[in-house]
């Protein structure tokens, strides 16, 4: 699974640079505005970990807001894409979010993870590491697939399991088989609250620009949210 995810996102790195970061409505006009709305516009003197940086879109945005950013991703090609995007301005590391993080305790003011955690089967070790390297009262902000949408993929007879799903992404005339884990809402909420103080649960709404470009998909998102955003605090 892990090796397959790495290889798939190595292949997708160019696609992210050319299209997803500029034209992907579910990113540009749905998930990203809602995520950025939860962050201060001025992040000067703040140190932030971009956990699962992909091609570096969030990394660049955080730098523009004044933050000192460390970006990590499991895909070497995504790491290279991020380095091309933010030349010389950030430390970009190829590493697995399920491994020990090479940072000292209480390093970061914020940890941001955009649409990444659903590629991990078990969040416990990852959250233990995030809690360790996040400063007291620091913020963890992450987005994942919404379980209400993911349940439509299930091959199981019940909702409550954590299930490996294969999604087919059609990009630039090619189909990519992208594996992820579907999990119930209670897992997301309870696992997060075991390590952090829940501050806000956000079900993002698409922008009016999304509606202009894709009115039918816009209406679907108003009835069935695709992503879920969790904002929490590293309480003592």
Labelled PLM ranges:
Residues 1-43, 57-61, 78-81, 85, 139-168:
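Conserved class I S-adenosyl-L-methionine
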Residues 49-51, 55-99:
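Class I SAM-dependent methyltransferase SAM/SAH-binding core
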Residues 101-110:
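A short acidic, Gly/Pro-enriched loop at the edge of an enzyme's catalytic core
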Residues 109-124:
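A short SAM/SAH-binding and catalytic strip from SAM-dependent methyltransferases
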Residues 124-139:
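A short glycine-rich, Lys/Arg-flanked "PGG" loop and its adjoining helix->strand segment in the class I
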Residues 142-144, 148, 172-187:
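Acceptor-substrate binding/catalytic loop of class I
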Residues 178-202:
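Short alpha-helix
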């Amino acid at each position: 699974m892990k090796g397959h995810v790495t290889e798939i996102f190595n292949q997708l790195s160019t696609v992210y640079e050319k299209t997803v970061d500029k034209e992907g409505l579910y990113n540009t006009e749905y998930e990203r505005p809602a995520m950025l709305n939860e962050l201060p516009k001025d992040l000067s003197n703040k140190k932030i970990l971009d956990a699962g940086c992909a091609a570096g879109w969030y990394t660049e945005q955080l730098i523009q807001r004044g933050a000192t950013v460390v970006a990590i991703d499991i895909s070497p090609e995504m790491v290279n894409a991020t380095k091309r995007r933010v030349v010389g301005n950030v430390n970009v590391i190829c590493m697995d979010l399920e491994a020990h993080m090479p940072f000292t305790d209480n390093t970061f003011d914020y940890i941001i993870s955009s649409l990444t955690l659903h590629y991990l089967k078990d969040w416990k070790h990852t959250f233990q590491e995030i809690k360790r390297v996040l400063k007291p009262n620091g913020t963890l902000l992450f987005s994942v697939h919404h379980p209400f949408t993911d349940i439509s993929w299930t091959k199981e007879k019940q909702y409550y399991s954590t299930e490996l799903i294969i999604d087919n992404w059609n990009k630039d005339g090619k189909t990519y088989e992208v594996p992820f884990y579907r999990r119930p809402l209670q897992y997301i909420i309870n696992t997060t609250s075991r390590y952090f103080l829940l501050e806000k649960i956000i079900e993002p709404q698409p922008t009016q620009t999304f509606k202009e470009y894709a009115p039918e998909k816009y209406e679907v998102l108003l009835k069935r949210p695709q992503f879920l955003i969790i904002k929490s605090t590293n309480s003592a």
